[in-house]
Amino acid sequence: MARLRLLIGLIFCLAISLDSVLSAPVISQISKDVVASVGDSVEFNCTVEEVGQLSVSWAKRPSESDTNSVVLSMRNILSLPDQRYNVTVTEGPKTGSAIYTFRIQNIEVSDMGPYECQVLVSATEKVTKKLSLQIKTPPVIAENTPKSTLVTEGQNLELTCHANGFPKPTISWAREHNAVMPAGGHLLAEPTLRIRSVHRMDRGGYYCIAQNGEGQPDKRLIRVEVEFRPQIAVQRPKIAQMVSHSAELECSVQGYPAPTVVWHKNGVPLQSSRHHEVANTASSSGTTTSVLRIDSVGEEDFGDYYCNATNKLGHADARLHLFQTVIPVPSLS
């Protein structure tokens, strides 16, 4: 008799367990991930079997990595007062099943993200499945993309352009004024611009261009400044002049940061005075033209002059020689 009671008890427990398994809610189907444009209407469907009296809700998570969700609806009642939202519950294809449909009209960028269909089994247990809503947005270059950069000549340079948008934007690079890229060509289809052993000729503006087929491409001009030692060019290293006439000595200086230019004679720096005038003119190309003008040249003004240019990377000198010339007197014979 005791064995019979034990057997009956085991059968009863097994029946309860089996009934519990058979009646557990199951999300048998959920809509696939959705891709839409701003202003469209979207619809999510979630089919739940063995739902019984359990509560089924739609919820939105801020991101894939954030597990906290905001409940949007519970059964057929909206939890948030948004006129764009609508939720309905209809009978499912199987007995005891139901389809929970959540609709959003006139979607906005803020609607993008993961959505969950949730079946609340108990206070600590729920059955969930999720889908993702991706919204097509035109490319926007991110703020963490630099607007300028500084590099010393001879170093390597890497510039990475970041852009947001969906589909994921493609990045390309082009030089300002359609100039040739350091590696050749006029366009580089890479997110990162790499220049090995930067040269001063690489300085200038580079456009980061982002495009994904949605709206207009976005672009940003990034200024590349290259630091380099001063370099001096002299077109006329020897200047002939007569006494009592004016003379001009000229040198062209390049360098970054812009060098300080000083003229010397006999180791003494020359400054603008009644006898000497120094004029420095900077051009848009980064070249400084320095002119030393001497009014009414005297005997003591002849000799060597030095154009000296200095910046934080070094200095350069160029020698110019002012010598006396005379007008030949024609012979009377």
Swiss-Prot record:
Top-level lineage group: Eukaryota
Signal peptide: 1-23
InterPro entries hit by this protein: Cell_Adh-Cytoskel_Orgn, Ig-like_dom, Ig-like_dom_sf, Ig-like_fold, Ig_I-set, Ig_sub, Ig_sub2
GO molecular function: receptor ligand activity
CDD domains: Ig
Record-annotated Ig-like V-type domain positions: 25-128
Disulfide bonds: C46-C117, C161-C208, C251-C307
Annotated SMART domains: IG (SM00409), IGc2 (SM00408)
The entry's keywords: Cell membrane, Disulfide bond, Glycoprotein, GPI-anchor, Immunoglobulin domain, Lipoprotein, Membrane, Repeat, Signal
Ig-like C2-type domain residues: 139-223, 230-323
Any one of the GO CC terms: side of membrane
Membrane topology of this protein: Lipid-anchor; GPI-anchor
Location(s), subcellular: Cell membrane
GO biological processes: heterophilic cell-cell adhesion via plasma membrane cell adhesion molecules; maintenance of blood-brain barrier; positive regulation of epidermal growth factor receptor signaling pathway; positive regulation of glial cell migration; positive regulation of glial cell proliferation
Residues listed as glycosylation sites in the UniProt record: N45, N86, N308
Protein name: Protein amalgam
Organism this protein belongs to: Drosophila melanogaster
Lineage, uppermost ranks: Eukaryota, Metazoa, Ecdysozoa, Arthropoda, Hexapoda
